Amino acid sequence: MSLGLVGRKVGMTRIFTAEGDSIPVTVVDVSDNRVTQIKTVETDGYTAVQVAFGSRRASRVTKPLAGHLAKAGVEAGEILKEFRIDAAKAAELSNGAIVGPDLFEVGQKVDVQGVSIGKGYAGTIKRYNFGSGRASHGNSRSHNVPGSIGMAQDPGRVFPGKRMTGHMGDVTVTVQNLEIARIDAERKLLLVKGAIPGAKGGKVFVTPAVKTKGAK
């Protein structure tokens, strides 16, 4: 139950430490995070903060959403995201408030959620790291086949979850315990150590890590 930020994946680069070590980082733009609604137990049954990110033309906003944003006095955003927080933290915020990168600090562990890059239809070797069959010595036209997918009459079906060919990627992925290597407060950028899910320009959600115990 912690407040997070909505960001846009800019791309990857590297930074250098004082010792000269090269650290690969992903640049995340977290500008224009603005509060559009504060939900409370009394009115909504739970406590949360709704945040808008980015911009959207007024002609592309539905009338109910336009009324909702007008009530908060906030411009339409490209995306709305809700974060569950405690009542004490919610009391410190108000509609229209800007939430910036100062929410985090350098060295803090965070979880980053995004939609992975779609790879299209893929075989089991690419999708699940299956091994190929033998190149020769009795193998004819069965070099990259997945093999058996089950038994015969008993049980007479393919078990759910069987790893087979299919669409790869384009799914929601959360990478946990990434470290914030640097914060550019002026340009409102987070530099996260390592890679995060998604393509350049993709939307990501950055929240404080929930499994910090034992994290390296």
Swiss-Prot record:
Keywords: Methylation, Ribonucleoprotein, Ribosomal protein, RNA-binding, rRNA-binding. Methylated by PrmB. One of its GO terms (molecular function) is structural constituent of ribosome. It comes from the Bacteria. One of its GO terms (cellular component) is cytosolic large ribosomal subunit. The modification N5-methylglutamine is found at Q153. One of its GO terms (biological process) is translation. PANTHER family: 50S RIBOSOMAL PROTEIN L3, LARGE RIBOSOMAL SUBUNIT PROTEIN UL3C. One of the primary rRNA binding proteins, it binds directly near the 3'-end of the 23S rRNA, where it nucleates assembly of the 50S subunit. HAMAP family: Ribosomal_uL3_B. Belongs to the universal ribosomal protein uL3 family. This is Large ribosomal subunit protein uL3. The lineage of its organism: Bacteria, Pseudomonadati, Pseudomonadota, Betaproteobacteria, Burkholderiales. The gene is rplC.
